[in-house]
Amino acid sequence: MDKVYVEGMEFYGYHGVFTEENKLGQRFKVDLTAELDLSKAGQTDDLEQTINYAELYHVCKDIVEGEPVKLVETLAERIAGTVLGKFQPVQQCTVKVIKPDPPIPGHYKSVAIEITRKKS
């Protein structure tokens, strides 16, 4: 299966289990991999035969900057479900949601979750 990557997207959202996260908000990063057949796009040089990266970006933006949720797992599920539902050629997608600055003590680069979902 071929892959389209949209990586390093950054958004500001109000997600988390702590009141401070819901009030102050924080940065979130998203990496998205969509799996689909890209052979027709490569042969025809036609955008209609692939998926538009900008549309994938806006799906992620709308969800992360939208309704607050408690868990990054919920954000990832919503992104994956929307991508699989909205883009017919996509057969599988992987979504990684990264919290660069979670409100927990310690030294670390970030915390993240990653899910992979397929069309049924």
From Swiss-Prot:
GO CC list: cytoplasm
Alphabetically sorted, this entry's keywords are: Folate biosynthesis, Lyase
This entry's Enzyme Commission designation comes to 4.1.2.25
| Name by which UniProt lists this protein | Dihydroneopterin aldolase
Any GO BP annotation: tetrahydrofolate biosynthetic process
- Check the record and name the InterPro entries matching this protein: Dihydroneopterin_aldolase, FolB_dom, GTP-CH-I_C/QueF
Keyword Lyase in the entry? The reply is yes
**Protein function:** Catalyzes the conversion of 7,8-dihydroneopterin to 6-hydroxymethyl-7,8-dihydropterin.
Report the pathway entry.
Cofactor biosynthesis; tetrahydrofolate biosynthesis; 2-amino-4-hydroxy-6-hydroxymethyl-7,8-dihydropteridine diphosphate from 7,8-dihydroneopterin triphosphate: step 3/4
> Which superkingdom is the protein from?
Bacteria
Q: Which residues cross the membrane?
A: none
> GO molecular function: any one?
dihydroneopterin aldolase activity
What start-end ranges are recorded for coiled-coil regions in this protein?
Answer: none
- Binding positions for substrate per the UniProt entry: E21, Y53, V72, E73
Reaction catalysed by this enzyme: 7,8-dihydroneopterin = 6-hydroxymethyl-7,8-dihydropterin + glycolaldehyde
**Which residues constitute the catalytic centre?**
K99
State the family named in the UniProt similarity comment for this chain: Belongs to the DHNA family.
One Pfam family per UniProt: FolB
**Keyword field contains Lyase:** yes
